Amino acid sequence: MRCPFCGYEDTFVIDTREIEDQRVIRRRRECPNCKNRFTTYERIEEKPIMVIKKDGRREPFDRNKLLAGLQRAVVKRNIDNEKLEAIIDEIIANIRKQGISEITSKEIGKMVLEKLKDLDAVAYVRFASVYQEFSSLEEFAKLLSQMKKE
């Protein structure tokens, strides 16, 4: 690999580690010419997941968009971002395990609700109210009564 500092053609690897659940390889390299060190990452290039929106549009899955929705649902709850990231990782893994490249936003919403149900009831209700587009107090009451039965 070419050195980013001096352009020398032949650098060598001094350390290799697997990170992110063995899905990424991190390599520390050194240039024999200028002695500078740098890091490279090797990742599997995965087929992008396309999300089919309610209106039929298709757009690439956006992890940050889902994270923002989860963060809104857990505002002022004692839930850290690591748990939210783990939920997203599980959802992505589930989609990939199914071997599909397209999924509806509705299906993603259902997956999120299943994860939030186990994590935090308030976050679950908040997310459900947006996901299911509640427009009245009766819809909230219905959801809460269903939750009490379960």
From Swiss-Prot:
ATP-cone domain segment(s): 49-139
GO biological process, one term: negative regulation of DNA-templated transcription
Cofactor binding, note field: Binds 1 zinc ion.
InterPro entries: ATP-cone_dom, NrdR-like_N, RNR_NrdR-like
Alphabetized GO MF terms: ATP binding; DNA binding; zinc ion binding
Keywords: ATP-binding, DNA-binding, Metal-binding, Nucleotide-binding, Repressor, Transcription, Transcription regulation, Zinc, Zinc-finger
PROSITE patterns assigned: ATP_CONE
Domain of life per record: Bacteria
Chain positions of all zinc fingers (unnamed): 3-34
S-S bridge residues: none
Cofactor requirements of the protein: Zn(2+)
Matches recorded under PANTHER family: TRANSCRIPTIONAL REPRESSOR NRDR
NCBIfam families cross-referenced by the UniProt entry: transcriptional regulator NrdR (TIGR00244)
Function according to Swiss-Prot or TrEMBL: Negatively regulates transcription of bacterial ribonucleotide reductase nrd genes and operons by binding to NrdR-boxes.
Family: Belongs to the NrdR family.
Name of the protein this chain belongs to: Transcriptional repressor NrdR
Organism: Dictyoglomus thermophilum (strain ATCC 35947 / DSM 3960 / H-6-12)
